[in-house]
Regions:
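Hydrophobic alpha-helical transmembrane segments in multi-pass integral membrane proteins
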Residues: 49-58, 112-126
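Individual transmembrane alpha-helices with interfacial aromatic-anchor signatures
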Residues: 101-116
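Conserved small/polar residues in nucleotide/adenosyl-binding loops
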Residues: 128-134
Length: 138
């Protein structure tokens, strides 16, 4: 069960980035692409935040998991939340024709999404002897 939520995150990223976005880009003109994709990204990153929170809860409840799992779950929450928060600024830069700002924000979003993918792929292989501390009085 530990790997369930990271697996969902990996699957969602692959589906969105490798299938949905390219298909929309190829089939819609730029105006309709923007209208269609804008409502999807906030939902996508919000979903990744929620899945990452569930992953963190799972890690917390299973003391046999390592500190690395905790780091992956917390990092996933932070990175997805940052991507979510910068969406309005990215859209504003696009609307205002500010290509430089758009390029920077888009690069951050893409980079963080790739890091999210790598971290969550690494989740099942990061079992080590470095385990989370458990309370001695429970």
């Amino acid at each position: 069960m530990h790997d369930f939520f990271p697996g969902l995150i990996v699957g969602a990223i692959i589906l969105k980035v490798a299938i949905i976005a390219p298909t929309m880009f190829k089939t819609l003109d730029s105006s309709n692409f923007g209208k269609a994709i804008r409502p999807l990204w906030p939902k996508f990153f919000a979903m990744v935040v929620v899945l990452s929170i569930f992953s963190l809860i799972t890690v917390y409840l299973h003391s046999d998991l390592s500190v690395y799992h905790m780091i992956i779950a917390v990092s996933s929450i932070v990175l997805a939340a940052i991507c979510y928060v910068i969406i309005p600024a990215t859209n504003r830069a696009t609307d205002n024709g500010d290509h430089k700002t758009f390029k920077i924000l888009h690069r951050i979003s893409v980079s963080f999404t790739v890091i999210l993918l790598i971290l969550n792929i690494a989740f099942p292989v990061s079992y080590t002897h470095l385990t989370l501390p458990t309370s001695s009085w429970v």
